[in-house]
């Protein structure tokens, strides 16, 4: 709800009147004699004899219909000659927001005519109540006259386009390592940004990388500067489509079927346009670093994330949500140069949909892998439909010159869990080999939650039953290889045959939490089966947190079996600090680690970690890291060294640069939709809608994330702004579109508080309720009891003021003044106000 910062002079004025003249109220009669019958100010006080009376004008209010909030809007009150008081005008904007049946409205407003249509006449069966103190407008009327909408519904006409602006996210990681024999350094810069013009949004993401290696023998390997382009596209939404149109380089966002890169056109639905109550993921990456290590995450061959982590377990839970499938490859480069990697499965299973709801995508264009675009033209259509409350139908078609595929499946919700299954048929042609392959793939999954006992079971089986089943990427890749080598070369390609996954999580109450997972998979062209198991348990003993992780990996083709155990302990050391210890064993390798970490600062904007580790072979390492978060981004640094004389240093920074009509603002990394705040002269005020965000010197700040097609509340805490800055409101509402950049302008004024203790030449104080204006006729303040003029509207540091308590020359006086408008403190001056002689 919007709040007001009321001017100090108005509060003082009202308080002075009440203290000076105790009033006995009877039958809601307003005693106009307090103000000289109103003649002094030219105000008709009779209107205030009516309950909840209001002056004509424009106001901001929260709109409610039968106690259901509809949102925030400007409302207009105008004098009604028939009743002799100001009444609410029924404007086109208000009509749209109330969302009533046609039968409820007997007189509609005309958008091209400014004549006020009074709400009492337009909706005779409704009762309007404006509560000025709470800034609320409430309408009560029969429920049958309201349109039944889902909870949280917002009319598309209220979606806000936002402002023209540009933004660029950056994620910089500099890594330097070396020993007496080899030294290396690398630089990674991830970029994600674009430009907004009207309803259109241009977006691009990519990464720049560079590395250098130097050996003691004099050999130097200076890698080339490399920029890897990701997506570059133009997009806008359309309410009529309940979706968006995308043109350029993008990934198909199919939740079922195959996902791939295209350069072309896509039309797809967007469930976020639905009301929140009608709406139906990037995975969390977990791992363990033995030393201060660089972690890179890749999807579909493209680096999407890179960070330096200290020794010990790490969790990465801030990956950008991805609308397409593709396992994540996680690479861990230790400070001694060793590189380990593992796979995090990521497959977007088609969820169940509400009855009657439709999700679709139609995409076409040239096939694209990473930064390369090929000649093959691809057309894909995806359709999902909620047939009943329990059954969702899924279908997909994929077509190119040498490849066709079709998918049909269903999602089934039952009392014993949720099932999904689909079958895919494929036809792949290899012209240079003069062969074609027809194959099929079957897939099924099952999941169930036992909330009563805290059990979650997910069973997913992927089975490729046919040797001749090929995906689109398989087919295009093989055909290009055959063409490159004139059909003489047959590359070895591993195509999945069977894959089975199962995971179980169990809450044991005070006994902790248990997690079990396993997967097994094999390939047509490869003998043997790969199997992985993982068992994890976590609990707390008094203030000591502990966990244990057991895992096993078996490769039957090579006969290799890898067993590992990981044990961790964490002991709090007061508020926001802890000591951590871990023990891990993998095969014959044993590692132990001890560390201290925590956060500090008024808003915990600083964090640190210090670690020491060793293994059973005498290897020892030490590392330290420090990070800082503030309004303009986050910064990190780390250093490590070991007993093998390896040393590494890492520096990192992430944030955003936003260009807009009020200038350029540095920010924390921004999301798909975000908001720019501007409040003139309010530098230092905290933004309540963003962590560790304050207005900069120019009165600008960025709220890094907003939710599209929903009401977002943007608030400011003015306590850290200058004392003489006055906010008209400290909270605003916005309803941004997807990919929009909202501009939230908080109107402010510099309330330089100057008190003039005015006396007339005869020694009497200037009459209370007098008004003062400057030489240009602009209002500067009111006179309260004792002849004190609250002059908070001064615009010039010196000049002449005219004080009036009537229209006659004898009811006026003048005086000259000189003050400091930059002084935020209250200034007090004793002055004689001269009357006409």
Swiss-Prot record:
The Gene Ontology biological process annotation of the record reads: pilus assembly
Q: Provide this UniProt record's keywords sorted from A to Z.
A: Cell outer membrane, Disulfide bond, Fimbrium biogenesis, Membrane, Signal, Transmembrane, Transmembrane beta strand, Transport
For this UniProt entry, which residues form the secretion signal? 1-26
Q: Which Pfam families match?
A: PapC_C, PapC_N, Usher
Alphabetized GO MF terms: fimbrial usher porin activity
InterPro entries membership: Fimb_usher, Fimbrial_membr_usher_CS, FimD_plug_dom, PapC-like_C, PapC-like_C_sf, PapC_N, PapC_N_sf
What membrane topology does the UniProt entry give?
Multi-pass membrane protein
**Places the protein is found:** Cell outer membrane
Q: Which Gene3D superfamilies match?
A: 2.60.40.2070, 2.60.40.3110, 3.10.20.410, Outer membrane usher protein FimD, plug domain
Q: Which GO terms describe its cellular component?
A: cell outer membrane
Provide the disulphide bond pattern.
813-833
- Superkingdom, according to UniProt? Bacteria
Family note:
Belongs to the fimbrial export usher family.
According to its UniProt entry, the function of this protein is described as: Essential for piliation.
Q: Which PANTHER family match?
A: OUTER MEMBRANE USHER PROTEIN (PTHR30451), SLR0019 PROTEIN (PTHR30451:SF5)
- The identity of this protein, by name, is Outer membrane usher protein HifC
Q: Which organism is it from?
A: Haemophilus influenzae
Q: Which gene encodes it?
A: hifC
């Amino acid at each position: 709800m919007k709040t007001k910062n009321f001017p100090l002079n108005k509060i003082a004025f009202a308080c002075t009147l009440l203290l000076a003249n105790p009033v006995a109220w009877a039958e809601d009669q307003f005693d106009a004699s307090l103000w000289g019958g109103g003649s002094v100010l030219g105000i008709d006080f009779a209107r205030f004899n009516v309950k909840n009376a209001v002056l004509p004008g424009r106001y901001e209010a929260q709109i409610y219909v039968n106690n259901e909030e509809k949102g925030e809007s400007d409302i207009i009150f105008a004098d009604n000659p028939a009743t002799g008081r100001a009444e609410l005008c029924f404007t086109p904007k208000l009509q749209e927001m109330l969302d009533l049946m046609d039968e409820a409205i007997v007189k509609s407003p005309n958008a091209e005519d400014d004549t006020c249509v009074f709400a009492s006449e337009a909706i005779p069966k409704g009762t309007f109540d404006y509560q000025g103190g709470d800034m609320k407008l409430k309408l009560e009327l029969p429920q049958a006259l309201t349109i039944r909408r889902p909870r949280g519904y917002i009319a598309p006409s209220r979606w806000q386009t936002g402002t023209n602006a540009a933004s660029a996210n950056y994620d910089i990681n500099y890594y330097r390592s070396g020993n007496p024999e080899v030294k290396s350094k690398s630089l990674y810069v991830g970029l994600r940004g674009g430009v907004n013009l009207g309803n259109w949004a241009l977006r691009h993401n990519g990464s720049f990388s560079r590395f250098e290696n130097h050996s003691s023998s004099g050999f130097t390997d200076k890698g080339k500067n490399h920029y890897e382009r990701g997506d570059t596209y133009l997009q806008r939404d359309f309410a009529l489509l309940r979706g968006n149109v995308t043109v350029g380089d993008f990934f198909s966002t199919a939740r079922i079927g195959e996902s791939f890169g295209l350069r072309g056109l896509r039309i797809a639905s967007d469930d976020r346009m639905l009301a929140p109550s009608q709406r139906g993921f990037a995975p969390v990456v977990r791992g363990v670093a033995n030393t201060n290590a660089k972690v890179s995450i890749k999807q579909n061959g493209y680096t999407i994330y890179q960070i330096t982590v200290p020794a010990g377990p790490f969790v990465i839970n801030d990956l950008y949500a991805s609308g397409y499938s593709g396992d994540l490859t996680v690479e861990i480069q230790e400070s001694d140069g060793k590189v380990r990697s593992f796979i995090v499965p990521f497959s977007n299973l088609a969820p169940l949909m509400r009855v009657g709801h439709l999700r679709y995508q139609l995409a076409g264009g040239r096939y694209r892998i990473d930064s390369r675009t090929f000649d093959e033209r691809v057309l894909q259509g995806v359709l999902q439909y909620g047939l009943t409350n329990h059954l969702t139908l899924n279908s997909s078609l994929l077509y190119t010159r040498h490849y066709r595929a079709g998918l049909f499946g269903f999602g089934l919700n039952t009392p014993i869990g949720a099932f999904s299954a689909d079958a895919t048929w494929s036809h792949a042609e290899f012209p240079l080999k003069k062969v074609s392959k027809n194959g099929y793939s079957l897939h099924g999954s099952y999941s169930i939650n036992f909330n009563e006992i805290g059990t979650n079971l997910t069973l997913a089986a992927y089975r490729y039953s046919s040797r001749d089943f090929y995906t689109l990427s398989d087919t295009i890749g093989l055909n290009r290889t055959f063409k490159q080598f004139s059909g003489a070369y047959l590359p070895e390609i591993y195509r999945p045959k069977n894959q089975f996954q199962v995971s179980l999580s169990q809450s044991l109450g005070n006994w902790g939490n248990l997690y079990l997972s396993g997967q097994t998979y094999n390939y047509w062209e490869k003998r043997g089966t790969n199997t992985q198991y993982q068992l994890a348990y976590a609990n707390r003993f008094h203030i000591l947190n502990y966990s244990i992780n057991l895992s096993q990996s078996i490769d039957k083709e090579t006969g290799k079996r890898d067993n590992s155990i990981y044990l961790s302990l964490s002991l709090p050391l007061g508020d926001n600090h802890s000591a951590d210890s871990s023990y891990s064993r993998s095969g014959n390798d044993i590692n132990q680690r001890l560390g201290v970490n925590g956060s500090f600062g008024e808003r915990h904007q600083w964090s640190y970690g210090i670690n020491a580790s060793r293994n059973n072979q005498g290897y020892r390492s030490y590392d330290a890291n420090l990070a800082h978060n503030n309004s303009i981004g986050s910064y990190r640094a780390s250093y490590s060294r070991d007993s093998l004389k390896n040393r590494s240093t890492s520096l990192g920074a992430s944030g955003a640069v936003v260009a807009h009509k009020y200038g350029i603002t540095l920010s924390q990394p921004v999301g798909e939709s975000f908001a720019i705040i501007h409040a003139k002269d309010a530098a230092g005020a905290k933004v309540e809608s963003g962590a560790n965000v304050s207005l900069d010197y120019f009165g600008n700040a960025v709220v890094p994330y907003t939710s599209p097609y929903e009401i977002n509340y943007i608030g400011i805490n003015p306590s850290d702004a200058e004392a003489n800055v006055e906010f008209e409101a400290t909270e605003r509402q916005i309803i941004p579109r997807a990919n929009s950049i909202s501009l939230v302008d908080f109107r402010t004024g510099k309330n330089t508080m100057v008190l003039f203790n005015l006396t007339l030449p005869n020694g009497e104080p200037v009459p209370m309720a007098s008004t003062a204006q400057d030489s240009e006729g602009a209002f500067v303040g009111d006179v309260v009891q004792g002849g004190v003029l609250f002059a908070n509207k001064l615009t010039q540091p010196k000049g002449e003021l005219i004080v009036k308590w009537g229209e006659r020359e004898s009811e006026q006086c003048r005086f000259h003044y000189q003050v400091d408008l930059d002084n935020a403190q209250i200034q007090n001056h004793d002055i004689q106000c001269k009357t006409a002689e």
